[in-house]
Amino acid sequence: MEQFRNIGIIGRLGSVQVLDTVRRLKRFLLDRHLHVILEETIAEVLPGHGLQTSSRKMLGEVCDMVIVVGGDGSLLGAARALARHNVPVLGINRGSLGFLTDIRPDELEVKCAEVLDGHYLVENRFLLQAEVRRHGEAIGQGDALNDVVLHPGKSTRMIEFEIYIDGQFVCSQKADGLIVATPTGSTAYALSAGGPIMHPKLDAIVIVPMYPHTLSGRPIVVDGNSELKIVVSKDMTIYPQVSCDGQNHFTCAPGDTITVSKKPQKLRLIHPLDHNYYEVCRTKLGWGSRLGGGGD
């Protein structure tokens, strides 16, 4: 297994709990004589830290591994910056759900020690890349680990659009919006809209209409290498928005085309050896526990 010597730390701002956990993590790593590099925004709220700092954009170039302290939203933001560097990412959960940041604060030292000793699992999670084109010219681009969402923004009106997959016309729809999600994002917004849960190892993309104006509008699961095109109706009078992971946004105009496809670079997500995806789903989604006479 890969050995890690240069460890980057990213933390969610505005949380006392996150800062406390970052301080614990910093002490733990320094006690193991590792080189610790702080992402510059978290470094600003840790005066006197005496450590090397780096921008988020460059952190992946100078680290063997990056540890994200926060919730899934924090890791989503980090993933978009780090995927292109192929640097492994480990998450310590200081949020509400923790599908991606799966180490609890109370087990920080034990689980991080296991990972640093070479006992860990690696998952390669693919991202989506989205581009909005107007009259043949790109006017907006973004990446997403969870989902790319077409929505009406501040308007309460429905959006009318056409869907194409690999150049083939699929259908036109009138709906509150459309969610294009990865397997990672299948337990996020797409799940709330009635989409299926997809195991992270699946090479697939799910297309989920948001409250479609027809009972036949259902989620579609397509090959992960598919190229999706969404064409906003020229007859629209509103300017819908495209959001990547709910964090990056750009505005569309009637007639614009949104292209969504798999990004070449993947996120290398690290888990402790005892990580169990189905246990995570059972815990986070409130699934039923084992029956008294259940199987082994």
Swiss-Prot record:
Q: GO biological process annotations for this chain's record?
A: NAD metabolic process; NADP biosynthetic process
Q: Which cysteines are joined by disulfide bonds?
A: none
| Gene name linked to the record | nadK
Active site (record annotation): D72
Q: Where does NAD(+) bind?
A: D72, G73, N146, D147, R157, K174, D176, T187, A188, Y189, A190, L191, S192, Q247
What does the record give as the function of this protein?
A: Involved in the regulation of the intracellular balance of NAD and NADP, and is a key enzyme in the biosynthesis of NADP. Catalyzes specifically the phosphorylation on 2'-hydroxyl of the adenosine moiety of NAD to yield NADP.
Q: Where in the cell is it found?
A: Cytoplasm
User: What organism is recorded for this protein?
Assistant: Pseudomonas syringae pv. tomato (strain ATCC BAA-871 / DC3000)
Pfam families for the chain = NAD_kinase, NAD_kinase_C
Q: Which GO terms describe its molecular function?
A: ATP binding; metal ion binding; NAD binding; NAD+ kinase activity
The name of this protein is NAD kinase
Enzyme Commission code: 2.7.1.23
